[in-house]
Amino acid sequence: MNKSILHTIIIYTLASCPYCIKAKALLDKKNVIYEEIEVSNFTQEEKEAFIKKSGGKNTVPQIFIDNMHVGGCDDLFNLEQDGRLDKLLETQPKNKNSLTVSGA
């Protein structure tokens, strides 16, 4: 199977956040590749950029699919409940590998 990434999924998290764990579990259940960015070590500049990118939200998780801000955990589960998450992910390669990136 070709493992080229057709969608970019990024989830900003904190290790101890139960909502982050829940959101990642749903993405894992969907068997998709995502990039996890741990925000605990962000510099002030990185925090400000994260908040701006998240539409003023400073909570985690914040989830992006192809640079589109999906929102937080509840938003992700609402997409799932409405049947829209699968449509967003349908061409995403099936692979449980995830990548964890820490702030600078």
UniProtKB/Swiss-Prot annotation:
Subcellular localization(s) per the UniProt record: Cytoplasm
DNA-binding recorded as keyword: no
Cysteine pairings via disulfide bonds: 17-20
UniProt keyword terms in alphabetical order: Cytoplasm, Disulfide bond, Electron transport, Redox-active center, Transport
One of the GO BP terms on file: cellular response to oxidative stress
Molecular function GO terms recorded: glutathione disulfide oxidoreductase activity
Pfam families, A to Z: Glutaredoxin (PF00462)
Highest taxon of source: Bacteria
Residues in Glutaredoxin domain copies: 1-96
InterPro entries: GLR_AS, Glutaredoxin, Glutaredoxin_subgr, GRX_bact, Thioredoxin-like_sf
GO cellular component, one term: cytoplasm
UniProt key word Disulfide bond: yes
Role of this protein: Has a glutathione-disulfide oxidoreductase activity in the presence of NADPH and glutathione reductase. Reduces low molecular weight disulfides and proteins.
Quaternary structure and interacting proteins, as annotated: Monomer.
Similarity remark: Belongs to the glutaredoxin family.
NCBIfam families membership: GRX_bact
Protein name: Glutaredoxin 1
The encoding gene: grxC1
